[in-house]
Each structure stands twice: as structure tokens, then as C-alpha cells.
Design a protein with these regions (language model features):
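Bacterial N-terminal signal peptides that target proteins for export
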Residues: 2-11
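Hydrophobic helical h-region of N-terminal Sec-dependent signal peptides
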Residues: 13-18
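C-terminal motif of bacterial Sec signal peptides marking the signal peptidase cleavage site
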Residues: 20-23
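N-terminal, intrinsically disordered, polar/charged segments of Gram-positive cell-envelope systems
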Residues: 28-78
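Betabetaalpha-Me/HNH-type nuclease active-site subdomain
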Residues: 81-156, 169
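Short Cys/His-centered divalent metal-binding micro-motifs
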Residues: 160-185
Length: 236
């Protein structure tokens, strides 16, 4: 298990190329069934934070996958600390875009089975883009804000944004696995929040900010972070 001795609050910067594996699904299995995009309620708390992140605060991409921000401090308070597992997904905004997704990840809400199909969900900015020089061929993918491995949330349109393989695998996945491994190995809980960052009326997020903090030890000896991916559209 990957452990850190201080709170890690990182802004993930990813130049998006190719398709995603874990947390995202290739566009090749896209469905035309729009009726399955209806809003799904969370399995726990519904009081997700209205926290937002301004794209103005995101550093320009400099080739680095991650860059620390806000002194490595996640934005959770003592009142947020709870050992009761929950997951919560904000309502889509007026443009139909995902907003904040939040959870207290515990073993009791982690999935016991394999992830199901998510091709019926079409996040904002979605279209099929296929290139021979892209790994897996399909450039754009459906990316979970809160990974399936953490809460078992599958085809929820409040939890899926348009992204790419680099965005997911090189950026989000290491942190998702850090959280998942910690919870599975210790039985403790992790506060976890993912906030998409949109620039103006753009339908594809500029990135996502991810925060996590272990509850039982208040993040002092385990996992705590945030990261952001930029851009979710490829450089051309």
C-alpha cells in the first residue's frame, strides 16, 4: 500500500491522449439509448458540498502530471469527519454538467462484483473520436468522478464525465488505488471528494480536483490528496 506521512493535495495536469481503462469506458461500446440517462440517487447521504473550483486557479500545463496546490491541505473540516460510509452526487447544472461528487469510503460500500456497462450514459461534450495512433483507438471515454472500485457506483450520469485514458490511468487511478488499498487493508474510512473544473460554458471539463483524507487518523499517517486533470480535451 502506498502511504504518505503528510497530507497530499495535488493538482493533476494531464495532456489527454488515448482511451481510459479503469474508471472510464471506451467509446466503442456507446449506446444510443438516451432513456437510461435518467438521474440516479446516491446510496447514502445526499448533502454533497457545493464546493466549486475556478479554472482561473489552475496552472498552465507544463508537462508535469501533478503539481501541489494550497500547501498540500485538502479542504475538509473536523465537522466533515465521520465513520459512517456514504456517497453523494450533486445535481447536474443548467448545462447538464456533472458537479461535486463526495463520499466517505468504507469497506461496506465497496463493490463485490465487476463493473457493469456504462455505454448508455453520454456525458456533456461526448462524441466518438477514433484514431489509429491512439491506444485502444477511441480518444474519449466516460470517466467516473468517484471510481467504481470505491463505492460501486456504475452508470450514474451525475458521476461520469468525458475524459481520456491519460486523464484516468496516469492521473486519477494512482490516487484511487491509494484510497482503495488503504480502506481494504485497514478497514478505516476515507473522505473523498471530486470536483470537475469547467472553463466558462465548456461542456468538457478542464480537469477534476480530487481530495481525500483518512478519517480515523485525520490524515496524519495515511492518504490525503487532491488532483486535477488538464486538459480533458487533447492538444492538437
Amino acid at each position: 500500500m502506498m502511504r504518505v506521512t503528510k497530507k497530499l493535495y495535488a493538482l493533476l495536469i494531464a495532456g489527454m491522449m488515448a482511451v481510459s481503462l479503469v474508471g472510464c469506458q471506451s467509446t466503442g461500446n456507446s449506446s444510443n439509448d438516451e432513456s437510461t440517462q435518467n438521474e440516479q440517487s446516491s446510496k447514502g447521504s445526499t448533502n454533497s458540498s457545493t464546493k466549486s473550483v475556478s479554472s482561473d486557479n489552475i496552472p498552465d500545463f507544463s508537462g508535469n502530471m501533478t503539481v501541489a496546490v494550497d500547501n498540500n491541505d485538502p479542504d475538509f473540516t473536523s465537522k466533515d469527519l465521520t465513520t459512517k460510509s456514504y456517497e453523494s452526487y450533486s445535481r447536474l447544472d443548467s448545462e447538464g454538467r456533472c458537479q461535486v461528487a463526495e463520499a466517505c469510503v468504507g469497506k461496506d460500500i465497496m463493490p463485490k462484483g465487476k463493473r457493469g456497462a456504462i455505454g448508455m450514459v453520454k456525458p456533456t461534450g461526448w462524441h466518438t473520436a477514433k484514431y489509429d495512433n491512439v491506444d485502444g483507438k477511441y480518444l474519449y471515454n466516460r470517466c467516473h468522478l468517484i471510481a467504481y472500485q470505491l463505492t460501486g457506483e456504475n452508470a450514474n450520469n451525475k458521476n461520469l464525465i468525458t475524459g481520456t485514458r491519460s486523464f484516468n490511468v496516469d492521473g486519477m487511478l494512482p490516487y484511487e488505488e491509494m484510497v482503495g488499498d488503504y480502506v481494504r487493508e485497514t478497514g478505516n474510512h476515507v473522505l473523498y471528494r471530486v470536483t470537475p473544473v469547467f472553463d466558462g460554458d465548456d461542456l468538457v471539463a478542464k480537469g477534476v480536483q480530487m481530495e481525500a483524507m483518512s478519517v480515523e487518523d485525520k490524515g496524519e499517517d495515511t492518504v490525503s490528496y487532491t488532483h486535477l486533470t488538464l486538459p480533458t480535451t487533447p492538444y492538437v
